[in-house]
Amino acid sequence: MCKITENIPNGARNPAYLPEDFDRPMVFIAEAGDIVGTRIGVKTDWYCLCLDADAHHFNKEHPIFHGPFEVNISVELKPTPSEAFRFVRTDGQPLPDSLEMWRVQTKGYKTEEGFRPGMIARPWGFADSPDAEYISGGVSAKDIDAVAMGRHGNFFFWGFSASPENMTDEAQTVFANAVAYISKFAGQTPIARRYKSDIATREYAVQQKDFISYKRWQERMVVEKQYIEKTEEIKKVALAKQAKGEKLTSEE
């Protein structure tokens, strides 16, 4: 794939892989949504490279869960990701203690050391234009509304990182359905583009107001303290192992 480079206002050269009039259907896997998409205004930007193995808040009525290949989605009630409670919801609704989840991958980076994490996109803008769809969220370190699967124009975003061999059988089928689904958008392009990921939207403003509150500062200090304590523990173990001439792990 070749790069198209153009001058941008700050004098740097920003690489692009596709022209803005590209109208062929395409599926973005994980961070490819950001690397390839955002340069041409696709809303699949890099919110966090922290998507794990489960999906939640998925639209069960969406076509990718119904065909062309038949699939029966297995759901399980699991605890709401703890990180999600750090974010205020723009609809003002409290988060439940547990969520209905669907297993997409057989492995995830949280339980499998060295496994590649997926990427989630910012949710703002997936519901305010006819060319975009929110399809599913996923377990991550960000808010509950972050996008793990979605569509913008002729681009389908599959934020999960696993190759087919590490997908569940159900996910393999849904992925095939997603490829078939996005093919219907051949000849179309995004209508409302977003070139700046943190552009001030109503949702972003609400979230930022919450972030600067004293309550959130206190919570952040607790997290920072826990991180420092964990780091010191790892350091202590690593130094002891090093003194004995033992091999250190990648984390150490």
Predicted ranges, named:
Residues M1-T38, R216, R220-V222, Q226, ...:
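Helical hinge/lid and interdomain linker segments adjacent to catalytic or ligand-binding clefts
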Residues I8-P15, E61-V71, S82, M167-T168, ...:
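Short, structured coil/loop segments at alpha-helix boundaries
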Residues A12-P15, I120-R122, D143-I144:
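A generic local structural motif
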Residues P19-F22, H57-F58, A127-D128, M149-R151:
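Extracellular/periplasmic catalytic domains that process cell-envelope and extracellular macromolecules
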Residues F28-S129:
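An acidic, glycine-rich "communication" segment
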Residues D128-E252:
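Extracellular ligand-binding/catalytic regions of CAZymes and related secreted enzymes
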Residues N7-I8, E112-F115, I135-G138:
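A short linear-motif detector with a strong N-terminal bias
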Residues K3-P9, A32-V36, E70-V71, S140-K142, ...:
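Solvent-exposed loop/turn segments at secondary-structure junctions
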